[in-house]
Amino acid sequence: MTKKYALAILAIPILILSAFKPAQNPAPKPELKWYGWNEGYAKAVKEGKIVLVDAYTDWCGWCKKMDRDTYTNPNIIKKINEHFIPIKFNPEIKDVTYNIDDKSFKPEELYQMLTNGNATGFPTTYFIFTKKMSLQLEPGYKDSVSFNALLDAAIAESKK
């Protein structure tokens, strides 16, 4: 009987102390905020950042893989959030108008302008350097390692 009381007496302080243990909240997971064209392009011009355009379609399996594998990488997210304004662009969406400065474009017109008339397939990543008003494109799926190198090259290009 005394062993039960002794055990209870030892257990009570342990339970009380564990109740006051500070919560260990994990660090918040970094998130990538995607913009629509009109908001994102204007923001990039205003802030002097690089526009990163992810051209995709709803039926594109490689686009979905890139969303799932590449754009969820914490290092990629951090780099994009710091140096770029990311924009999702689906040229197959209808009844939308995209603005660049004082001009308006239909989705297929913007796509033709981005590709310079040479369709590249999906996904394609476009880097628009707003300070120089120049454009680079990189067609196809990119894993985190190769995409990180692309981001570094775009950042270096923007500083020239």
Residue ranges, per PLM feature:
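Thioredoxin-like thiol-disulfide oxidoreductase module
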Residues: 74-77, 81-135, 139-146, 153-154
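A short beta-strand-turn-helix
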Residues: 32-50, 80
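Detector for the c-type heme attachment site
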Residues: 64-68
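Bacterial Sec-dependent N-terminal signal peptides
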Residues: 1-26
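Short, low-complexity, Pro/Ser/Thr/Gly-rich segments in the mature regions of secreted, periplasmic
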Residues: 155-159
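Short active-site neighborhood of thiol/selenol oxidoreductases, capturing the structured segment around
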Residues: 47-61, 86
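Sec-dependent signal peptide cleavage junction
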Residues: 21-32, 160
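Soluble non-cytosolic domains of exported or imported proteins
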Residues: 35, 54, 70, 141-145
